[in-house]
Amino acid sequence: MGFEDDIFKITPLAIDINDTRSLHVAELVRDALRNMGKVVAASKIALLGASYREDVGDTRYSGSEIVVRKLTEMGAEIVIHDPYVKHWWELEKQESYPAPGHSWARFFRNQEKLQDSKVENDLQATLKSVDAVSWPSATMPT
């Protein structure tokens, strides 16, 4: 048995969906701004949540990183809020973290300004004068 069998057809598809969901979030933000008569390149966007899951300060393998990188490539100004994260090393030290030449930055344009990114702990300060909010882990109330 292998990937040629019908049993495992869903596995590569699931991996593809998981790998591209962050890019889809950036596209949804772009589309929402467009519907409001705004363009990404002239917008300030708040990202709520930098870590890979709720209530932790670990940003390794965070889907939010790709959202930030794609929106930055589109020209957006990004402000970041996460009460558990003090530094987002993948952005701040992108030339050397996790290792030289291994940053996601190499796949996106206009990433230089992300080195000056600061994670804000004060939600009110983060939301001041933003055009949109990207909250990757948001759920709709039931």
Please name every model-derived segment:
Residues M1-T142:
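Structural/interface elements that position substrates and couple domains in central-metabolism enzymes
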